[in-house]
């Protein structure tokens, strides 16, 4: 017998209040992304300030992302158990403290600790925003709301490039990072005063609330709840497919924007910082433009999910290969521009991972399933950030060899996607099949059999 459909019986209505509450959540996420990506425009400055080489520099982003990825499942469990508001509030406090600490750190070790704290707070934002979208808007809007959240996140990246970089180079390190930390305090006010987990009358169903209460009783009950949530989510092939889609699509752009894009464009391609910053901005602008397109396509046609994801991977690999094997020391500007435009597809494609995990899990597991999925891209990003730094040190700053690690992880991810897609799609069709008709209904029995095949 198949499991009951995880889709809610009655969708929340959406509307203006939903938009207002959701906007508070994405504002917190927006600030978190500014803080997360601020090192991307300050990589060379950080190397000078703390007197570190490429491997040590990559450790900043690596540690931040290690904490972020490691927190995804715990955060998903926290969202499922405590609700969105509490988790978002804690996250905002932590990432604000981390950004301020990074501004004032006098040593490399203290700066690393500050980035870890920032990563911990940052980890609590995106899954919470996804949960707000599913609690406040109809299910048919879920792909679009997820893409909109990703778009707002990329806008935060844009602020890092267009606003923080000039302030950093004009006013200095402390003014740029400490000044930006004020934004964290600003978003805390509406978060604490006005954000609600769900609309009135659309809270968790009684069965879900009872399960949470029961799981919280008795010694070791918390551990049992954690195991049940993780095991049940991971058992669904849609969750695993979502993780690998996220893993394979997101990391090429993340590596470029978070740390290695600016050094690659300046040191390997001979561009000025201004021109390199413009190309980083182009990645973000492309992402924002394409996010809505991907969201509309997936929302209207679920069958477009895998072609979009795999097509994005193929296009990204092709452009990176063209840049890295181009004859001569430097690729032409038109090719670098094309690469940056294509890297803008990585973020929207990574959101497709959540569109596989979401229908595979009931409401009470959405946070956990989203956390598992969201680990994928950040694990790939961490691996590539470290590999590029190590290879740059080992090869005397040979960016062609260092960036070839992109192809290894893309090949791994594609192989896993192809292996899981059949089982995930079959399970999704099973969950969406009509519920069995009661045995006494002879008239309705035949249509029910026809519908289920």
Language-model features and meaning:
Residues 39-40, 236-291, 384-385, 389:
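Extracytoplasmic gate region of multi-pass secondary transporters
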Residues 148-202:
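Helix-loop-helix hairpin linking two adjacent transmembrane segments in secondary transporters
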Residues 71-83, 290-304:
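Helix-to-loop junctions at the C-terminal end of transmembrane segments
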Residues 114-153:
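Cytoplasmic helix-loop-helix junction between adjacent transmembrane helices
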Residues 81-91, 299-314:
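Cytoplasmic membrane-interface "Motif A"-like loop-to-helix N-cap segments
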Residues 70-109:
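Conserved MFS/SLC helix-loop-helix module at the cytosolic interface between two early adjacent transmembrane helices
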Residues 51, 83, 104-110, 121, ...:
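Helix-breaking motifs and short loop linkers at transmembrane-helix boundaries and internal kinks
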Residues 6-15, 198-243, 434-440, 444-449:
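Juxtamembrane intracellular "pre-TM" segments in multi-pass secondary transporters
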